[in-house]
């Protein structure tokens, strides 16, 4: 089992301009994510959710404290962590199969082997016939599936997901939430996902971490079992309609409202 850990990790943006003040974005974050866990981070704007993901990815380094993978300090991006953004960031001049195979090409895998592996991954994400299609021929949901397949190509220990479904319509988003859970289970990786949606957090998470804003601090770390219900075969619509789901949704809404200024929350 691998573990991604934040130990007293703080992030400070330096002052800008003569009269600017340094900004404390994240304050003494203590958090761990293990393989086999799906941890979802929620919080208001200004709580540092994306900054937290950037630290995990190695795009930024903490100003204080440390972020480590299996005890080794993270000093930059690595193939043991794969990032999926809201924007699919695919290469439009390549077809879907070659997009998925691109990380394998960088690793030096031969063409025949990487194309075979890309085909396996496209089948995993439900797109076995899409390999020769150009990216601009695919719907938004299909592009995100290709992006997730590409992220899995290097067999990362952790998937880092920055609102990967946020730009999709409600129906496609709901369908891909169940798909994402299934892919995570089959990949046997750990997952750290950022979202504004309490509903999405409850459906996907094995643990929900709530960040308070300005600066971002861990306000709560709560286990959740609804994802296990869905993976066991319960329809997401029935899970959403359950009294337990509604109680936890209301509780999280109240918590987030209590720790930040009034503003609209995503359902």
Curated annotation (Swiss-Prot):
The keyword NAD does not apply. It is a peripheral membrane protein. GO terms for molecular function: ABC-type taurine transporter transporter activity; ATP binding; ATP hydrolysis activity. ATP binds at residues 43-50. Pfam families: ABC_tran. Residues 6-238 form the ABC transporter domain. PROSITE patterns: ABC_TRANSPORTER_1, ABC_TRANSPORTER_2, TAUB. Keywords: ATP-binding, Cell inner membrane, Cell membrane, Membrane, Nucleotide-binding, Plasmid, Translocase, Transport. It catalyses: taurine(out) + ATP + H2O = taurine(in) + ADP + phosphate + H(+). It is an enzyme of class 7 (translocase). Its EC number is 7.6.2.7. The keyword Transferase does not apply. Its main location: membrane. GO terms for cellular component: plasma membrane. It is found in: Cell inner membrane. Belongs to the ABC transporter superfamily. Taurine importer (TC 3.A.1.17.1) family. The complex is composed of two ATP-binding proteins (TauB), two transmembrane proteins (TauC) and a solute-binding protein (TauA). Part of the ABC transporter complex TauABC involved in taurine import. Responsible for energy coupling to the transport system. This is Taurine import ATP-binding protein TauB. It comes from Sinorhizobium fredii (strain NBRC 101917 / NGR234). The gene is tauB.
